[in-house]
């Protein structure tokens, strides 16, 4: 069914879309009495290899694995009444072609199982996917085929011709684009991941959730588009869309249309698909279109995130607007705030994703707001215990945060932000026409105390301090924040406790950050949330988990266990938000797992053990690797990398001007040739004319390495090698008198190191990078074990 006639009455049109999405073949096995031949495998034997299942045949794959490829129905469409059923427990590893006259029901089984290959293709036939099913390789639809997905998981959906896909449940990931005019995707339930491109086809949404859609025609009556949808024709009458790109043949059906707060009719244009809005390089404020769709869902579109080019506004009768105050409690979900409404989100309550609030009061008092909140001429209040997701956009609204957590990428345009507590994630944008007030104390600009009420922030400035509730904060361009002028309101702060803080599985009141002089240790079962910030502190990670959005300033972090940051694959790590280690901080990695780390401005990372996903070394940063496993390392200008041992990944050096990479080991090879004239104790700079080569050898701890070096595009990048005569011996914990054994003669030297405040690796019995009272118990345990 091709949905092009935009003049059909709205209610009838929506009904037709729903009917089409529900018109699929029954997602169940047919009665075997309707077939001349019925094959149940097992127990029946059937040779699947390269065979064609002909007319009036039902094949039931009940259990086991079938690796062969086969065709269901003749390629010319002359066969009829054919059915293949793949039941739970069955795995079909080959490629299946469902031609005209055939039906394939995947009833909990697997097709194209992992590492077996094989696609499932509806070439004029019908394929039904139900709960529990998994389609690992491509699920293709072409040549008039139909695919109905009511459950299960489809990893690679691919429309390659004139076909229809109906999604009423399950999870579907896109694989390829379709250029067919007659390709149709109908979604009423389920989740669609990735980008679905139907440049000449049609997308009809009445429910469910999708991420990105490109289509010639889009007809939306419900559901959620969490990222973006682009179309050149269609009708938008409901649902929620995070970002849109619509042109002149698209109709917005609803009412209460306002452009920049003024009534608007006819057609409207704002934003451009070909432009990027930057609040600091513009001549006028962003345009904002608000309204309510025909289903009663409010919307907010702006020239910041959306593009509308001569889109038609169609006014219809809207559902009544109840302005009675609404409390959203446990288990309750709200999907939009219309003019004059007051919504209060209590603990357990939820504001759903891509929620739009227009002329609304929204109080979050312990509840949760999902990603993509959009505010227009509204008031948002966030109190302690609340969570607001990422990507909140505020236009002409007042945002008051006194507690809780607001996710990254909060944008405030031509409104106000008042921050007195809680925490806000990275990427805060305050439009020059908006005002921001921070209530608290201990304010510093680039580490220097300030008392002036108004502060202007340059491109490289960092503003830090403590909010009125005692939570430390920092805003800087290097963390993605964009602020020009901020008003600071000084108030008395709660005292910062100097008692060491332990966070484990039993901890209830977990701090949102650390103030100067505080010490925190994360033990097994402990967990620190997003956007944790620490200034002038000691921060120990012995177990548990710490978020990757942690920021460290003028502090020492010792990781001897647990997980510090997100642990991902190399490809995923490229898009991960890094841990920030800055302003003369020290990161010691002795054990445990560490994610992506960005280190700069006089800070040093020492890696002697554990696993570190990736280092990004910024200006003034230094990384020393003596052991453990380190992933890729990217160097920028004015940086130092010293490698003594352990293993490490690829070095990215193209931006490493005025930097140095230094290797220490027992022997070195240049492009496979031994450097045999390097004396023990000698340090040699490799000739600057060597721009593309491989350096290999044995590091000082005995680890072998081979590292391609490319410095063709750098200026003054020095590569040095230092030869030592023997492999370094591992540290013997507890052997403080360095006699090669641990016994009671080590007690007095241990006490001397402890009281002096000095560092000796043998006395660091808890391996957290410092010697203090925390080493007493493990030292006693070592002695007791003798």
Question: Model-flagged regions — what are they?
Answer:
Residues 2-12:
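Bacterial N-terminal signal peptides that target proteins for export
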Residues 184, 398:
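Cationic, beta-structured binding surfaces that engage anionic biopolymers and membranes
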Residues 29-32, 38-39, 43-47, 54-59, ...:
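Cellulosome-associated attachment modules in secreted, modular CAZymes
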Residues 22-28:
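Sec/Tat signal peptide C-region and signal peptidase I cleavage site
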């Amino acid at each position: 069914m091709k949905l092009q006639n935009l003049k059909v009455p709205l209610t009838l049109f929506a009904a037709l879309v729903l009917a089409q999405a529900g018109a699929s073949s029954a997602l169940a096995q047919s009665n075997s009495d309707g077939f001349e031949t019925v094959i149940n495998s097992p127990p029946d034997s059937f040779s699947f290899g390269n065979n064609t299942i002909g007319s009036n045949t039902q094949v039931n794959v009940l259990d086991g694995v079938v690796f062969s490829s086969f065709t269901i129905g003749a390629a010319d469409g002359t066969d009829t009444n054919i059915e293949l059923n793949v039941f739970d427990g069955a795995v079909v590893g080959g490629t299946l072609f469902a031609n005209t006259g055939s039906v394939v029901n995947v009833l909990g089984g697997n097709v194209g199982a992992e590492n077996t290959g094989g696609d499932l293709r509806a070439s004029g036939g019908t394929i039904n996917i139900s709960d529990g099913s998994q389609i690992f390789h491509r699920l293709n639809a072409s040549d008039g085929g139909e695919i109905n997905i009511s459950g299960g998981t489809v990893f690679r959906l691919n429309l390659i011709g004139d076909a229809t896909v109906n999604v009423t449940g399950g999870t579907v990931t896109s694989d390829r684009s379709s250029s067919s005019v007659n390709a149709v995707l109908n979604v009423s339930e389920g989740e669609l991941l990735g980008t679905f491109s139907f440049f000449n086809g049609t997308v009809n949404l009445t429910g469910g959730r999708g991420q990105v859609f490109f289509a010639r025609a889009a007809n939306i009556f419900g559901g959620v588009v969490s990222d973006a949808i682009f179309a050149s024709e269609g009708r938008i009458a409901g649902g929620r869309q995070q970002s849109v790109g619509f042109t002149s043949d698209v109709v917005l059906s609803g009412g209460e249309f306002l452009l920049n707060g003024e009534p608007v009719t006819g057609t409207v244009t704002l934003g451009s698909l070909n432009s990027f809005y930057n609040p600091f390089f513009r001549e006028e404020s962003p345009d904002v279109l608000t309204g309510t769709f025909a289903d009663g869902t409010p919307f907010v579109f702006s020239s910041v995130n959306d593009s509308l080019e001569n889109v038609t506004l169609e006014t219809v009768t809207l559902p009544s607007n109840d302005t009675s105050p609404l409390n959203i409690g446990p288990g309750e979900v709200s999907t939009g705030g219309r003019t004059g409404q007051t919504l209060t989100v209590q603990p357990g309550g939820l504001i759903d994703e891509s929620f739009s609030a227009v002329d609304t009061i929204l109080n979050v008092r312990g509840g949760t707001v999902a990603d993509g909140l959009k505010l227009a001429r509204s008031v948002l209040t966030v109190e302690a215990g609340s969570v607001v997701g990422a990507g909140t956009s505020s236009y002409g609204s007042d945002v008051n945060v006194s507690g809780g957590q607001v996710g990254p990428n909060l944008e405030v345009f031509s409104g106000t932000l008042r921050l007195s507590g809680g925490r806000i994630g990275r990427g805060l944008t305050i439009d020059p026409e908006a005002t921001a007030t921070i209530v608290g104390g201990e304010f510093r600009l680039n580490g220097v105390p300030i008392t002036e009420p108004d502060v202007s922030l340059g491109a490289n400035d960092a503003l830090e301090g403590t909010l009125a509730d005692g939570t430390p904060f920092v805003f800087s361009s290097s963390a993605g924040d964009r602020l020009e002028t901020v008003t600071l309101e000084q108030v008395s702060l709660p005292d910062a406790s100097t008692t060491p803080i332990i966070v484990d599985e039993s901890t209830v009141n977990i701090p949102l950050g650390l103030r100067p002089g505080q010490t925190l240790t994360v033990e097994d079962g402990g967990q620190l949330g997003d956007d944790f910030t620490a200034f002038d502190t000691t921060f120990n990670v012995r177990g548990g988990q710490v978020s990757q959005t942690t920021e460290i300033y003028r502090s020492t972090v010792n990781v001897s266990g647990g997980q510090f940051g997100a642990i991902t694959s190399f490809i995923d790590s490229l898009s991960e938000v890094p841990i920030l280690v800055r302003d003369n901080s020290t990161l010691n990695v002795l054990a445990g797992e560490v994610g992506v780390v960005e280190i700069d401005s006089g800070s040093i990372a020492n890696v002697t053990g554990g696993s570190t996903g990736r280092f990004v070394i910024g200006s003034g940063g230094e990384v020393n690797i003596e052991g453990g496993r380190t992933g890729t390392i990217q160097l920028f200008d004015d940086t130092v990398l010293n490698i003594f041992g352990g293993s490490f990944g690829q070095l990215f050096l193209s931006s490493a001007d005025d930097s140095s990479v230094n290797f220490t080991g027992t022997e070195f090879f240049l492009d496979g040739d031994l450097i045999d004239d390097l004396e023990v104790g000698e340090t040699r700079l490799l000739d600057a004319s060597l721009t593309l080569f491989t350096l290999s050898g044995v590091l000082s701890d005995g680890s072998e390495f081979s590292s391609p070096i490319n410095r063709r595009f750098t200026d003054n990048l020095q590569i040095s090698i230092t030869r030592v005569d023997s492999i370094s011996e591992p540290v013997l914990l507890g052997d403080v008198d360095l006699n090669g054994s641990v016994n009671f003669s080590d007690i007095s030297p241990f006490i001397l190191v402890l009281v002096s405040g000095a560092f000796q690796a043998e006395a660091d019995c808890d391996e957290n990078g410092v010697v203090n009272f925390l080493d007493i118990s493990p030292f006693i345990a070592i002695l007791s074990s003798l």
